[in-house]
């Protein structure tokens, strides 16, 4: 998928991946890739800065955990993050409906 298509949608996708519960950064990357059948195989240099931005905005929070002797950060939605995800889903629904209607229209009405 072309990176420019992701612009403006990454935050909503990250919030959606965290909706079911906490995930560490690499698990977020895997969920995006697996949930999109490989179309969203994003580098850590894209995902981690976005996670940190969402945390600074108060939409997610993180906690350190130790697994098999290794420390890693687990991210999860806050109440504000859940509300933001709900709002972004509504906007996406409206946008995708309009774009689909335009792209699939055939034939276009004649203009005078």
Residue spans of the language-model regions?
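Beta-hairpin "wing" of winged helix-turn-helix
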Residues: 55-71, 76
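Amphipathic alpha-helical dimerization/coiled-coil segments
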Residues: 85-112
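Basic, amphipathic "hinge/linker" alpha-helix immediately C-terminal to the N-terminal HTH DNA-binding motif
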Residues: 70-89
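Basic amphipathic alpha-helical segments that dock to polyanions
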Residues: 47-54
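N-terminal helix-turn-helix DNA-binding core of bacterial DNA-binding proteins
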Residues: 2-46
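Short beta-strand/turn micro-motifs at beta-sheet edges
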Residues: 1-4, 62-64
């Amino acid at each position: 998928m072309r990176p420019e298509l992701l612009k403006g949608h990454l935050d909503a996708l990250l919030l959606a991946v965290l909706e079911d519960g906490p995930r560490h950064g690499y698990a977020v990357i895997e969920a995006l890739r697996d949930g999109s059948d490989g179309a969203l195989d994003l580098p850590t240099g894209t995902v981690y800065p976005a996670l940190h931005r969402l945390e600074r905005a108060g939409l997610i929070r993180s906690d350190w955990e130790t697994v098999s002797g290794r420390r890693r950060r687990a991210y999860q939605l806050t109440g504000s993050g859940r509300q933001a995800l709900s709002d972004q889903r509504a906007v996406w629904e409206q946008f995708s409906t309009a774009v689909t209607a335009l792209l699939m229209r055939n034939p276009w009405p004649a203009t005078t």
